[in-house]
A protein has these predicted regions:
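Outer membrane beta-barrel
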Residues: 104-259
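Extracellular loop and loop/strand-boundary signature of outer-membrane beta-barrel proteins
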Residues: 79-84, 144-149, 207-211, 275-280
Length: 296
């Protein structure tokens, strides 16, 4: 299974031409009473990416005698759906943020986004030598319904939380957040470590031209506390009351490396036209995720 996945990445990482344009549509700060304010910001982004090389023939039509045959036919829809010169992204997105502080130290923060990617609303370029080697039940020349929905456009609320900043002493202060937000205590260069467990990631957005870090970290419903004892010591903790899964590349989308995983995935193939249908995901309970930390 690993060989075809590596081949797919090796091809796609060097075979793209991308362009992105980002513009702040509106940004204002409106006074609210004597101490409060409402600050809002809307950012529009347009990104386009094009495939510059043809799909690898070994992945497109693997020989039945190939020992990696089953692995390849379950990892090639993202390759076959985009021919040389095809747009893999033609995406416009809008990100809106509203910070409403109703007193000197308390407020509500909201963030929402919407996008539309025309590349996933047309026909695919899937013309494999063998029929029925695509991993969804509809026509191979069409993206699966779940793929169109996840990669082609959606609108959703991201952050929605209350926050408060409280002075507790000459050098100490308490910050509290309640609601859906991101907690990230640290990160490393090559490995996510604790940050990878605290916040799920929307993998699709990492590969979108013009995407920013705040675009692909998924907020989670939780209560978090940051207590600065003095300028040197800080203790912190959080407890999550919501489970959110990471968003994998949609099956058949360009960056997908497993046709049976992610939105739009419908079956695992053993041979052209023969396989197992994919069932619903089994989700864990919403509780049990918490953490305590200290920083010096």
């Amino acid at each position: 299974m690993q060989a075809p996945l590596r081949s797919h990445f090796a091809l796609t990482l060097v075979a793209l031409a991308t362009s992105a344009f980002t513009s702040t549509v509106a940004a204002h700060n409106v006074p609210l009473g004597e101490e409060g304010f409402v600050r809002y910001n809307f950012t529009a982004n347009y990104g386009v990416a094009k495939r510059l090389e043809a799909p690898d023939a070994a992945m497109a039509s693997p020989a039945a005698a190939d020992p990696l045959y089953v692995g390849k036919i379950n990892a090639n829809d993202g390759d076959l759906n985009f021919k040389k010169g095809a747009l893999i992204n033609n995406r416009v997105s809008l990100l809106g943020e509203v910070d409403a502080r109703y007193s000197a130290n308390q407020g509500v923060f909201l963030r929402a986004q919407a996008f539309y990617d025309a590349a996933y609303h047309g026909r695919t370029d899937n013309n494999a030598a063998f029929p029925n080697t695509d991993n969804h039940a509809s026509n191979a020349a069409e993206f699966a319904r779940g793929t169109r929905r996840a990669a082609g456009g959606e609108a959703e609320f991201l952050d929605a939380y209350w926050y408060g900043d409280f002075k507790t002493g000459d050098e100490s202060a308490l910050n509290v957040k309640v609601g859906r937000h991101v907690v990230q205590w640290g990160e490393s260069l090559f490995f996510a470590n604790i940050a990878g467990a605290q916040s799920p990631v929307d993998v699709n957005k990492i590969n979108v031209p013009g995407a920013q870090v705040k675009d692909f970290l998924l907020p989670v419903g939780q209560v978090s506390v940051n207590y600065s004892l003095n300028p040197k010591w800080t203790v912190m903790g959080y407890a999550q009351y919501e489970f959110r899964e990471a968003k994998l590349p949609a099956a058949g989308s360009f960056w997908s490396v497993a046709d049976f995983l992610g939105p739009g995935a419908e079956r695992f193939l053993f041979a052209p036209g023969f396989g197992l249908s994919r069932g619903n995901d089994i989700k864990p309970s919403a509780g049990g995720q918490w953490g305590l930390g200290a920083r010096y």
